[in-house]
Curated annotation (Swiss-Prot):
Mn(2+) 2 binds at D306, H311, H359. InterPro entries: Alkaline_phosphatase_core_sf (IPR017850), DeoB (IPR010045), Metalloenzyme (IPR006124), Phosphopentomutase_DeoB_cap_sf (IPR024052). This is Phosphopentomutase. Isomerase that catalyzes the conversion of deoxy-ribose 1-phosphate (dRib-1-P) and ribose 1-phosphate (Rib-1-P) to deoxy-ribose 5-phosphate (dRib-5-P) and ribose 5-phosphate (Rib-5-P), respectively. One of its GO terms (biological process) is 5-phosphoribose 1-diphosphate biosynthetic process. HAMAP family: Phosphopentomut (MF_00740). GO terms for cellular component: cytosol. It comes from the Bacteria. It catalyses: 2-deoxy-alpha-D-ribose 1-phosphate = 2-deoxy-D-ribose 5-phosphate; alpha-D-ribose 1-phosphate = D-ribose 5-phosphate. Keywords: Cytoplasm, Isomerase, Manganese, Metal-binding. It is found in: Cytoplasm.
Length: 407
């Protein structure tokens, strides 16, 4: 019986890549800088002392970071016994965004350039805005700028509730984001608006990776909160991923936990499970692992590392999340059967000590564990697609066009 369990710690980079200069990210190091802050006592909010990740360390995390940067993260044990196989992987894709990272993990790197809305004010073409107002019968719109998702709620949330005008905003990523109040505007209405935006962006040739519904609740600035009903409308991957091949060629099952299905535009996904927050995502993952049959992938995205702590530049929060993940990791490991493999990885970096609020171009960790997986270094991987090619070989599907199997 063959089963693979893929856990993406969204944004958990382990040091800048060789091409980081192109992105303004030379020196970025999500894990390294979090560990450094913890070791200095600068991340003692909700936790205390050096970063404590014994289980991830046993799977090779500290060694993978050493391979990427040349040093063991501050306060972590570089001499701990390693029971997993580990690597650090470079991104072949042109961007440092979520779809690019995930698609490349599944064997399909993004070798084209996404479209972006680069102007920080008046970010969107008037023609596009006019079509959205007309088609969705809107009273107007707010925002039309680059912004952090939480900041813009404090700035415009009250006006949105009074006027019914949706908040349109973007970032350095290839995204069109729409924030609306779940109750005063309505969740279904927001989703319908996002569908219209997705159509217009696709038909207009803007080449934008994702439209993101950003519902929120609250009644005034300072207490607005985004809810777990986020929905991403992505374009489809440009070629069949290893997920699609498993389904098509082996009649396999691919279970999405969290936002995975959205990222792949539902391509190669046979079951979707929604969950919000680290503990709920863990619980849902464990349930699906227990029920998984032969030729099954359970694929989970732990989005909070990115959305709650990386983008918000919350070092202590990120550390709390990592330590929670580490404490619960043995629950996943204990469920593995003889032929199973567990892969822990990331899709990009988002260094919470870095300037701005955007992602960072970093190596990702690739930590592989299973009863039949030989422990030790798998070295520097030239593309995240090595993960996809490894899965293709493991399940016996046709080869992926990119990547080399790691074992």
């Amino acid at each position: 019986m063959k089963r693979a369990f893929i856990m993406v710690l969204d944004s958990f980079g382990i040091g800048a890549t060789e091409d980081a200069e192109r992105f303004g990210d030379v020196g970025a190091d999500t894990l390294g800088h979090i560990a450094e802050a913890c070791a200095k006592g600068e991340a003692d909010n909700g936790r205390k002392g050096p970063l404590n990740l014994p289980n991830l360390t046993r799977l090779g995390l500290a060694k993978a970071h050493e391979g990427s940067t040349g040093f063991i993260p501050a306060g972590m044990d570089g001499n701990a016994e390693v029971i997993g196989a580990y690597a650090w992987a470079h991104e072949m894709s042109s961007g440092k965004d979520t779809p690019s990272g995930h698609w490349e993990i599944a064997g399909v790197p993004v070798l084209f350039e996404w479209g972006y809305f680069s102007d920080h004010e008046n970010s969107f073409p008037q023609e596009l805005l006019d079509k959205l107002v007309e088609r969705a019968n809107l009273p107007g719109y707010l925002g039309n700028c680059h912004s952090s998702g939480t900041v813009i709620l404090d700035q415009l949330g009250e006006e949105h509730m009074k006027t019914g005008k949706p908040i349109f905003y973007t970032s350095a990523d290839s995204v069109f984001q729409i924030a609306c109040h779940e109750e005063t505007f309505g969740l279904d209405k927001l989703y319908e608006l996002c569908e219209i935006a997705r159509e217009e962006l696709t038909n207009g040739g803007y080449n934008i990776g994702r439209v993101i519904a950003r519902p929120f609740i609250g009644d005034k600035a300072g207490n607005f909160q985004r809810t777990g009903n986020r929905h991403d409308l992505a374009v489809e991957p440009p070629a069949p991923t290893v997920l699609q091949k498993l389904v098509d060629e082996k009649h396999g099952q691919v279970v999405s936990v969290g936002k995975i299905a959205d990222i792949y535009a539902n391509c190669g996904i046979t079951k979707k499970v929604k969950a919000t927050g680290l503990d709920a995502l863990f619980d849902a993952t464990i349930k699906e692992m227990k029920e998984a049959g032969d030729n099954t992938i359970v694929f989970t995205n732990f989005v909070d590392f990115d959305s709650s702590w990386g983008h918000r530049r919350d070092v202590a929060g990120y550390a709390v999340g990592l330590e929670l993940f580490d404490r619960r990791l043995p629950e996943l490991m204990s469920l593995l059967r003889d032929d199973d493999i567990l892969i822990l990885t990331a899709d990009h970096g988002c260094d919470p000590t870095w300037t701005g609020t955007d992602h960072t171009r970093e190596h990702i960790p690739v930590l592989v564990y299973g009863p039949k997986v030989k422990p030790g270094s798998l070295g520097h991987r030239e593309t995240f697609a090595d993960i996809g090619q490894t899965l293709a070989k493991y399940f016996g599907t046709s080869d992926m066009e990119y990547g080399k199997a790691m074992f």
